Amino acid sequence: MFLTCMETVTKELVSWMRGHESSVFSISVHASGKYAITTSSDTAQLWDLDTFQRKRRLNIRQSVGIQKVFFLPLSNTILSCFKDNSIFAWECDTLFCKYQLPAPPESSSILYKVFAVTRDGRILAAGGKSNHLHLWCLEARQLFRIIQMPTKVRAIRHLEFLPDSFDAGSNQVLGVLSQDGIMRFINIQTCKLLFEIGSLDEGISSSAISPHGRYIASIMEDGSLNIYSVQALTQEVNKPPPPLVKVIEDLPKNKLSSSDLKRKVTSGRVQQPAKSRESKIQTRILKQDLTGDFESKKNELPDGLNKERLQILLKGYGEYPTKYSTLIDKGTHVAFLNLQKKYPIKSRKLLRVLQRTLSALAHWSVIFSDTPYLPLLAFPFVKLFQNNQLICFEVIATLIINWCQHWFEYFPNPPINILSMIENVLAFHDTELLQHFIDHDITSQLYAWPLLETVFSEVLTREEWLKLFDNIFSNHPSFLLMTVVAYNMCSRVPLLNCNLKDDFEFFFHHRNNLDINVVIRQVYHLMETTPTDIHPDSMLNVFVALTKGQHPVFNQYPKFIVDYQTQERERIGNDELDYLRERQTVEDMQAKVDQQRVEDEAWYQKQELLRKAEETRREMLLQEEEKMIQQRQRLAAVKRELKVKEMHLQDAARRRFLKLQQDQQEMELRRLDDEIGRKVYMRDREIAATARELEMRQLELESQKRLYEKNLTENQEAVAKEMRADADAYRQKVDLEEHMFHKLIEAGETQSQKTQKVIKENLAKAEQACLNTDWQIQSLHKQKCDDLQRNKCYQEVAKLLRENRRKEIEIINAMVEEEAKKWKEAEGKEFCLRSAKKASALSDASRKWFLKQEINAAVEHAENPCHKEEPRFQNEQEDSSCLPRTSQLNDSSEMDPSTQISLNRRAVEWDTTGQYLIKKVRNLRQRLAAQARHRCQTAHLLAA
């Protein structure tokens, strides 16, 4: 589909616009003339008239459908009305939805078909297949009035406001074109009928009002065009007529009930304006209500009604009384529920009327529910009488009873007897044509039956078909059969040229270039010239009208076949219902299975996700643990490096101090050597004493050196380091119980280092231990409670190390028993003080013993001084172990082999260093003694 744009002055084609797939039934142009909206049944499109290009397109669901889309006058708003009674307002530029009108009250809800808007765009009038008019206030966006037209108005076909130059666009007069062809103009405020145009005899098909409201152009049902002068129609309307509508109550602003909106119709008479004798315009003012006239004359009617009176009744009421529609009220027959699939008719209204008519025929007689060609037979009559289904039904019923006699005797086969009549007549009048049919195996079922079952609707135009049936209905029923023969005889030339069966089929199913008047004349000729023995009128009954009140019974068909088919159809229908029920059950079961499968799949997926999440979390935890272990390893490595560096620094400081002392000693020795050289001659006898004195002084210097070194660098530092190590071990044991084993090893290393230091530095540590005994006692006393609580954990750790301590278990048990005995004998600080005094005494004795051993046996016992010190250290250790310290025993006893090995290695290193120093001192002494002896011998020789 495409739209053409024409220039009104030059009448030339400007452009055409493509885009619609179905016919366009509405065009609305914007007040500026820049935009236009075209509407079809499935879409509405917005066009730019400057470029003739499509800007936007409104698509909707097929189940809804568009009723109308148009611009509001003097506004930039687009109003869209759909078939579900929804009305939306859109902004033209942005196409933003401004608002939606609410649904009308259910009690007065109608399907809107036609719309009209005042020139100021404030009031929207809507109507449809009802005698109600809805007036919407677009500013308040609510329904403010319902106008009820007279009862003779059954449907509203067109609405249009009458413009007025003095109402500022708020039009008050609304033109309403109803189904009876009369256009009534009413005042929407006073609800009075002003005037009307058209009549029942000369109905209006469509109408339009000039922009200034001076003229009304109407196309009549007979095709004529009438132009009315509004001024002439309203010259006596100033005398107000009695209202047709009684105002019950205007709508309050806060209510929307249909009872408050509705204005009810009352009977009345409108004064008719005087007609001008010169005027030939056929207009009528509203006469008294036809309802009252017909009701008053109802009992005065004779036994029958003529055609003119029936037409008056039909135009006045729009339908016949209800008692004649009993067949229609039975609903759609089951045989025609899917009629649209076999006969896809574009017009839904026509399809609906055809379906209802066929259903009425099927309800009338069972045979028609199984007649396959019934839709083809009834379709032309349905299309002709689509606005009155009762007439359509009765015409078809009359046709079947009279012109379709004996058609159903051979059901479900074609009427062979009727076709034989046609063939006999054709054989009599045109033997050559019949012989041509016989030669090409063309039977009457091909050249006669297609024309009968479609009643010539496929081969004739509308006008030709109407002309033909005017003659058929006006003659004997045999006239229809003669028409078939006449049609073949008039078409003998093209038929004689056909040689293929497909050509014959095409010919009898399509229109041909044939004059229907010639055919009709030929039919009349055949009716007159056909012999009586083969004439169909001798075998067909004369015309019989339908009975009054109820329709006649139609049973001219093989009842057993129809009953059998009906039973089979019912059986098949029941089987289909059973099958559908079973299929529905299976589908329900399948749906449940699918749902269960989906739920199971979802559950499995959820479990899989949970498992993956758990694995991810576990991997993350493992990674974190690995990182923590690596960090701990790095921290331990850093600690080891720091300790090694500390030891190296201590060793370097000690070496520097020793070197300084050695240098000082060498300087002193050189000074002594010089002094001895000067006095050698004077003190020969004092050489031995001087040598001893020098040795003693050397020992004193060595002891002073060690004391100074220990006092300055290690005494306080060792004690502070010991206390810090103990405090750190205590805090680490409390905060990180899971790392007790590593901390225990560190505590063991610290204790081992302290033990080694005590072994190597007995003298200095003894003095400092006397000063810090109380401090250690207090710290150990605080740790006692926690040590008791963690004793259980230590025992569990001890189980893992018992295999490494099998050789020490007897010593540990003895120490534990000794500790238990001493714990019971004394408590608290007294035992600690006694232990401290004992340790001090042992330290003094050890110091005296050490000095004595160094002086008397420096050379003989220098190689294994540690063997002499070990018993003393063990005694001191036993004394110190008597303190109330359970953790000390456990720490010293629960060291692993690696810790013991590291302690032994350090002890060996300390022993090696001590031996080296002692060896160096011994060599120095030997050298000094040798020098002294050499000088002494030289002096004796000189003296001699």
Swiss-Prot record:
**GO CC aspect terms:** centriolar satellite; centrosome; ciliary basal body; cytoplasm
Tell me where on the tree of life, at the top rank, the source sits.
Answer: Eukaryota
What keywords appear on the UniProt entry? Cell projection, Cilium biogenesis/degradation, Coiled coil, Cytoplasm, Cytoskeleton, Repeat, WD repeat
Q: State the Gene Ontology BP annotations.
A: cilium assembly
- Biased composition (Polar residues) is annotated at 883-900
A molecular function (GO) held by this record is: molecular adaptor activity
- Quaternary structure note: Interacts with PJA2; the interaction is direct and recruits PJA2 to centrosomes. Interacts with OFD1; regulates its activity in cilium assembly. Interacts with PRKACA.
Matching entries from PANTHER family are given as: TBC1 DOMAIN FAMILY MEMBER 31, WD REPEAT CONTAINING PROTEIN 3 WDR3
Sum up the protein's function in the record's words: Molecular adapter which is involved in cilium biogenesis. Part of a functional complex including OFD1 a centriolar protein involved in cilium assembly. Could regulate the cAMP-dependent phosphorylation of OFD1, and its subsequent ubiquitination by PJA2 which ultimately leads to its proteasomal degradation.
Q: What is this protein called?
A: TBC1 domain family member 31
Organism encoding this protein: Pongo abelii (Sumatran orangutan)
Which lineage is the organism of this entry classified under, starting from the top rank? Eukaryota, Metazoa, Chordata, Craniata, Vertebrata
